[in-house]
Amino acid sequence: MIFWLRSVIVTFGRPAEWPRCLRHLCSRGAAMDLGPMRKTYRGDPEAFEETHLTSLDPVKQFAAWFEEAVQCPDIMEANAMCLATCTRDGKPSARMVLLKGFGKDGFRFFTNFESRKGKELDSNPFASLVFYWEPLHRQVRVEGPVKKLPEEEAECYFHSRPKSSQIGAVVSHQSSVIPDREYLRKKNKELEQLYQEQEVPKPKYWGGYILYPQVMEFWQGQTNRLHDRIVFRRGLLTGDSPLGPMTHRGEEDWVYERLAP
């Protein structure tokens, strides 16, 4: 940890190792200046140029980067993503979830329909996904409309999960207020006994969504903060539509551009 005190930078380790006066300041809500916290990213020779695109189809480009993330030993969950949703009156919320499949038709994830994200997607069926692979200094952002997956697909995936996860989905009415953790333990134990010798039925309030990508942005970090940003968006379907001088035609109905960092 770095703490600014009268223009002197003082560096500390874990909170338990901080001086008592600093722990007191933090507990009192003192402002923390995190300005000096920064990491070295890539150098200019490793810049992400347009010629480095694996494909002019952004879903295929995502697949290439995703595979690199999967193969990277320092990335524990390459399919972890931040899912951002929003109420109809503009109040956003975000949380980490797991990507469970992707292809030309979209990006799949599963959750509880009665959760906050489920309710927000019901009233405002648009979302944004962000994948951040820190060891590779890469980020991918995906935006688009969201719809529920067919019940058969949700049923199939639900029963492919470990039985403990299936029971967990039945136990937890996600985002509802509960008295304590013991409440979950007790209910979980009851259902483990109930379904010991039988299949766990998928709750009606649990299922999947698919986000159809309309915008996909690929970001790669540079140490000098002149980061690389190449964004794909769905353009006009007519092949003879004129493009701007800095807009390039991708595959099918995609166009792409470089954005200032």
UniProtKB/Swiss-Prot annotation:
Phosphoserine (modified residue): where? 241
Sites binding pyridoxal 5'-phosphate sit at 42-45, 100, 157, 161, 165, 225-227
A Gene Ontology cellular-component term:
cytosol
The EC number(s) given in the record are: 1.4.3.5
MF terms (GO), sorted A to Z: FMN binding; protein homodimerization activity; pyridoxal phosphate binding; pyridoxamine phosphate oxidase activity
What's one Pfam family here? PNP_phzG_C
Cofactor detail note? Binds 1 FMN per subunit.
Required cofactor(s) = FMN
Q: In which pathway does it act?
A: Cofactor metabolism; pyridoxal 5'-phosphate salvage; pyridoxal 5'-phosphate from pyridoxamine 5'-phosphate: step 1/1; Cofactor metabolism; pyridoxal 5'-phosphate salvage; pyridoxal 5'-phosphate from pyridoxine 5'-phosphate: step 1/1
Spell out the PROSITE patterns in the cross-references: PYRIDOX_OXIDASE
Q: According to the lineage, what is the superkingdom?
A: Eukaryota
At which positions is FMN bound? 95-98, 110-111, 116-117, 139, 174-175, 219, 229
Supply the alphabetized keyword list: Flavoprotein, FMN, Oxidoreductase, Phosphoprotein, Pyridoxal phosphate, Pyridoxine biosynthesis
Q: Which GO terms describe its biological process?
A: pyridoxal phosphate biosynthetic process; pyridoxamine metabolic process; pyridoxine biosynthetic process
Point out residues bearing the modification Phosphothreonine. 238
**The reaction(s) this protein catalyses:** pyridoxamine 5'-phosphate + O2 + H2O = pyridoxal 5'-phosphate + H2O2 + NH4(+); pyridoxine 5'-phosphate + O2 = pyridoxal 5'-phosphate + H2O2
Q: Which family does it belong to?
A: Belongs to the pyridoxamine 5'-phosphate oxidase family.
What job does this protein perform?
Catalyzes the oxidation of either pyridoxine 5'-phosphate (PNP) or pyridoxamine 5'-phosphate (PMP) into pyridoxal 5'-phosphate (PLP).
Q: How does it assemble?
A: Homodimer.
**The protein's name:** Pyridoxine-5'-phosphate oxidase
Q: Tell me the organism's taxonomic lineage.
A: Eukaryota, Metazoa, Chordata, Craniata, Vertebrata
Gene assigned in the entry: PNPO
